[in-house]
């Protein structure tokens, strides 16, 4: 049996190795001599495809470049790569608000679920209204004001009290209610019922059911528009009367119902998974970075060294600018970002794109709202020549700890240094430098004239209208008193005369 098994064994198949043809040494040498292995200089840099980059860095290669030189600082991080605690505290939720609870209740529940200190929303929805409610968390609440004033879109159902001709008539009536409209809040409203003007940008009829007299419509409008009032006006315009049956908000600002809208259950599940399984992926899908709300703004990219100064309220100056967008207009709202794509602040532009490209100094924008936390980036101000000299003098004891001059302060420092935080020194500096085209003699003459005018004013005190009125009243009162006294004396003499006449008659009688 064993012999049979031995006979049954099959021979092992050996894999054939692929034969490699060795390259002759001469050929390698020839290739090395023939080809130039170097990075060749080019007239233009290769194009980066940044169309798929996230949030505020999208298409950043299309921004105008003021300078490409800056010193990167290893602080901060890309908004999508923040540590989970920081990510939640600087994020927002595009929530599908359920029917029946009020907006404030929903926001309070979210705060309790995520265990954060502060939450806010993008505009109140009535209890029965559903749809897009942007819930901002902690740092993102700084953007609530701008989100509340952003445009909104709704889909509503209107019930008409009587039959109409058809969809065309409803469509014409809805088209009439476009543009600036007078509105008074409904009877049951949380605000004062004052007449107000609100703008309807666009509207259209989606569907009309003549049997049930129900019409579905879509409307894009200004923040604070009452769709309930719009439905009442629509009924009046059609001559049959109408009321709002149902309403859903489909867009709030730049975020719509198709942009990763989540429910309250999703938020609860995401927090549960993180608490019990340390799985933060679901939480990152529910919460989005606040930078997503600012993607419609024009961008200004700042150097890393200028970021913390802006967080402390410094002006946005041109030397700290790296890149800027096309089409910036004066008084337009812009967003200031870092090189990593983090939002630093929302600002009001003071220069147009054309002016920024031609100037080398000046204030580019003024801060409207700082978003980033202070000291996320290190302090980089106070490193200039004057500031360094001041620090040295404080160290040597020639200035006090606040930088104020002492007895041992060098005369050159007190003469040359201007402390712009001291208002008295500002005034003296302004007086010392008269305006262009005005000589010192002319300035002194003007000053002398002012002094003489003030002396004259002191010599002749002016009486105010109030004092004059009081004097007039006193005079009238005094005159009235004298007249009354005179009248009283006359009455007394008359009475005496009458008494004398009666006494004489009695004696004669």
Swiss-Prot record:
Catalytic activity: uridine in 5S rRNA = pseudouridine in 5S rRNA
Classification via PROSITE patterns: PUA
Residue stretches of biased makeup (Basic residues): 11-20, 466-475
UniProt modified residues of type N-acetylalanine: 2
EC number: 5.4.99.-
Record-linked InterPro entries: Dyskerin-like, PsdUridine_synth_cat_dom_sf, PsdUridine_synth_N, PUA, PUA-like_sf, PUA_sf, tRNA_PsdUridine_synth_B_fam, TruB_C
Record-annotated active site: 126
Biased composition, class Acidic residues, residue ranges: 481-490
Span of domain PUA: 297-372
Phosphoserine sites (modified residues): 388, 452, 454, 508
MF terms in GO: box H/ACA snoRNA binding; pseudouridine synthase activity; RNA binding; telomerase activity; telomerase RNA binding
Covalent link (Glycyl lysine isopeptide (Lys-Gly) (interchain with G-Cter in SUMO2)) residue numbers: 21, 40, 44, 192, 395, 425
Residue ranges of the region described as Nuclear and nucleolar localization: 447-509
GO terms for cellular component: box H/ACA snoRNP complex; box H/ACA telomerase RNP complex; Cajal body; nucleolus; nucleoplasm; telomerase holoenzyme complex
Protein name per UniProt: H/ACA ribonucleoprotein complex subunit DKC1
The organism of origin for this protein: Rattus norvegicus
Pfam families (alphabetical): DKCLD, PUA, TruB_C_2, TruB_N
Family of the protein in this entry: Belongs to the pseudouridine synthase TruB family.
Keywords recorded for this protein, A-Z: Acetylation, Isomerase, Isopeptide bond, Nucleus, Phosphoprotein, Ribonucleoprotein, Ribosome biogenesis, RNA-binding, rRNA processing, Ubl conjugation
